[in-house]
Amino acid sequence: MKQLILVSFLIAFNVKADDFSDINTLLDGLHEDAHRGNFEAYFGRYSSDAVFLGTDKTERWTIQEFKSYAKPAFADGHGWTYKVIERNWEGNGNTRWFDEILFNEKLGHCRGTGVVELINDEWKIAHYALTMLVPNSIAAD
């Protein structure tokens, strides 16, 4: 019985570790595709009903709206570049959520947060929000 429990624990742990490895690959690929302007590959990482929140208060886009916004930026083979500084994960079942600290030459340090879902055995980004980080010391009281 103890062996069965141990084997079950090890299998569950490995599945979770594999999931997080797959999701890290998904997001690392997202940022690489954006950097290289790989439009189809970039948007292929999102679910068909994904939502993207940009840094401006008006930037709440369905995936189709986000594609329209991004197409000109990707047209010359360059999108945008964010370097991943750190990433954290939580979740269970077919849903995971994450936060990541990014660096962009124009915007400085930013935070990306999002939700990924396992859809047809493939992790897809269902929600992504990009925010600029503002130190508390310079924020208005």
Residue ranges and their predicted role:
Residues 1-7:
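Sec-dependent signal peptide recognition
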Residues 6, 12-44, 48, 64, ...:
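Short, low-complexity N-terminal intrinsically disordered segments enriched in polar/charged residues
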Residues 10-11, 125:
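Short, linear, compositionally biased motifs with a strong N-terminal bias
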Residues 19-22, 67-108:
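Surface-exposed, charged secondary-structure patches
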Residues 46, 56, 86-88, 101-104, ...:
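A mature extracytoplasmic/lumenal domain signature
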Residues 50-61, 72-77:
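A short gly/proline-enriched turn/hairpin at secondary-structure junctions
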Residues 52-53, 98, 125-127:
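Short hydrophobic/aromatic-rich beta-strand segments that constitute the beta-sheet cores
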Residues 111-138:
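Short beta-strand edge/turn micro-motifs at domain boundaries
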